[in-house]
């Protein structure tokens, strides 16, 4: 009887460990690689002005965006806010936490950066979807 009580007590004290979401898993992979100088093409998939959609060529040095389309980066300019890979992975995680009705999540298996991401947050609302595409990734 003591053993049964100990087993039940032990099992009740255990917590269920939730698996990491894909964005967190890939952010961890990205961080393991310690990449701080890189470039990539970034495209938003949305019903947005073409200047906002892109594609935009982004250059990151020492973990900060330095240029967008060959010009010094300024978030207030017509392209809107651009993201480094870790920032984009945080945006993706925040969107996963919103529990979209549909999502497509594809990541580079070597480095963990997102390649194709898409979220639809409501089947009943048109044009609220958002997606991101990263191509031409290169470590500098």
Question: Predicted segments — roles?
Answer:
Residues 33-44:
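A short, Trp-centered hydrophobic/proline-enriched beta-strand micro-motif
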Residues 11-13:
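C-terminal motif of bacterial Sec signal peptides marking the signal peptidase cleavage site
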Residues 50-55, 100, 127-130:
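Short, surface-exposed coil-to-beta transition loops
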Residues 1-7:
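Sec-dependent signal peptide recognition
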Residues 15-18:
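Bacterial signal peptide processing site
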Residues 40-42, 65-70, 116:
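Short hydrophobic/aromatic-rich beta-strand segments that constitute the beta-sheet cores
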Residues 59-103:
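Mature extracytoplasmic domains of secretory-pathway proteins
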Residues 114-132:
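Short, exposed beta-strand-loop hairpins at the edges of beta-sheets
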């Amino acid at each position: 009887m003591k053993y049964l009580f100990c087993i039940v007590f032990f099992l009740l004290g255990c917590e269920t460990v939730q698996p990491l979401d894909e964005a967190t898993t890939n952010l961890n992979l990205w961080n393991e690689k310690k990449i701080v100088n890189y470039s990539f093409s970034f495209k938003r998939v949305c019903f947005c002005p073409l200047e906002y959609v892109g594609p935009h060529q982004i250059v990151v040095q020492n973990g900060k965006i330095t240029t967008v389309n060959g010009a010094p980066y300024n978030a207030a300019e017509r392209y809107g806010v651009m993201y480094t890979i870790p920032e984009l992975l945080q945006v993706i995680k925040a969107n996963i936490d919103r529990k979209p009705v549909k999502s497509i999540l594809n990541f580079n298996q070597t480095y963990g950066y997102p390649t194709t991401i898409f979220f639809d947050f409501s089947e009943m609302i048109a044009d609220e979807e958002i997606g991101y595409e990263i191509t031409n990734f290169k470590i500098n």
